[in-house]
From Swiss-Prot:
Keyword terms, alphabetized: 4Fe-4S, ATP-binding, Chlorophyll biosynthesis, Chloroplast, Iron, Iron-sulfur, Metal-binding, Nucleotide-binding, Oxidoreductase, Photosynthesis, Plastid
Complexes and interactors: Protochlorophyllide reductase is composed of three subunits; ChlL, ChlN and ChlB. Forms a heterotetramer of two ChlB and two ChlN subunits.
Cofactor: [4Fe-4S] cluster
Catalytic activity: chlorophyllide a + oxidized 2[4Fe-4S]-[ferredoxin] + 2 ADP + 2 phosphate = protochlorophyllide a + reduced 2[4Fe-4S]-[ferredoxin] + 2 ATP + 2 H2O
Record-given protein name: Light-independent protochlorophyllide reductase subunit N
UniProt gene name: chlN
Source species: Stigeoclonium helveticum
Amino acid sequence: MSQLITSPKINEKETLKFECETGNYHTFCPISCVSWLYQKIEDSFFLVIGTKTCGYFLQNALGVMIFAEPRYAMAELEEADISAQLNDYKELKRLCLQIKRDRNPSVIVWIGTCTTEIIKMDLEGMAPRLETEIGIPIVVARANGLDYAFTQGEDTVLAAMACRCPDKISTTSDSKNLETPMMIDNTQKNGQNSKALAHPPLVLFGSLPSAVVNVLTLELNKQGITVDGWLPSSRYTDLPALGEDVYVCGVNPFLSRTAMTLMRRKKCKLINAPFPIGPDGTRAWIEKICNVLGVIPTGLEEREKKIWQSLENYLPLVRGKSVFFMGDNLLEISLARFLTRCGMIVYECGVPYLDKRYQASELLLLEQTCLEKNVPMPRIVEKPDNYYQIQRIRELQPDLVITGMALSNPLEARGINTKWSVEFTFAQIHGFANSKDVLELVTRPLRRNMMQQVSNKTLVKPAK
């Protein structure tokens, strides 16, 4: 592996380099979003409409047996469905009535798959009619394998659910205040006992564990900002009200479709901010929200310094090391920015799909971070070709490769340290306090490699 890297002085005019290949994708199917969304939305039921292959994938990927009675199920398509010999509406009605009788959820989410796309099942046409008959809302989301990354399944579901949010009725006085928000000095408030400041409504979107939701909400409350709701909420009946006067901000970089729906369909105003991953990203996320809502942020610099001090045990392990992102879950840009701030060199940042408008603030912060740390700008490759990537890995010899599960073992067999990118999807990585979990995941293969080197040098006696 490469030794400590000393980078030359970087030209301040240097910018990020973007490339696009036509690579193949080794990633999970987007219907895997069911695994975390059915737990997040507690009164929901997810019905995946697909073939036996979809059922096998969900059974193996989620690891939940039928005896556990999870709040999701498979509606398996048979040959008669594909050849149009069966009435799709009657079959779906029978299943939904059974779901209502057994579970009585507040909402049923139909997840379309590749097969429903190919045979042109009119799920959107059947859902409203069936919804009135059974008396339960039905949300249709086509989270199929035609997307670029498996995390975009959540994006599809949230975009469909955003259309079901109630409309917020704005008053004339509120509209005037929104057009010219006044900067509110937040320095005189006394911690949690302070009253919430007057500001436009704010809704955050992105599925996070309840503990992380509470932490991010509390961080904004400390600045005097009230969060009017989250999309998705823990219960479908508690969806936030949306409208022209509402500001929205995302917490994940793979929610560009949801952001577009909120702006176009619900007329919300999007706060384009970096994502709250790492101390630097969390601070920038809070500061951008405060600036847009007209609140002067306080105490964030000291808060960030304390978090960096708590990471001192991890930073020496990553400082000067190199990392290569093959691209899997669309979190690559945010993780590359945070690891660059930690002192790592990012050779390449592969990403399955990049919405430059939605991730504009994140890309700008990555560029600024590289200039401040005096390191080369990473090469950002959209839709990377794995064959060419492996050639570049052999040439660059990075200390760590963050890749999907399909490519991890072959790379390990060639003596390359790898980390499963899917672990960052399911770990709690958002907010100030969870920065340690990110570095714990990154340093684990590095520490394992160091232990192997030590054991080979000191514990094995040379043959006489």
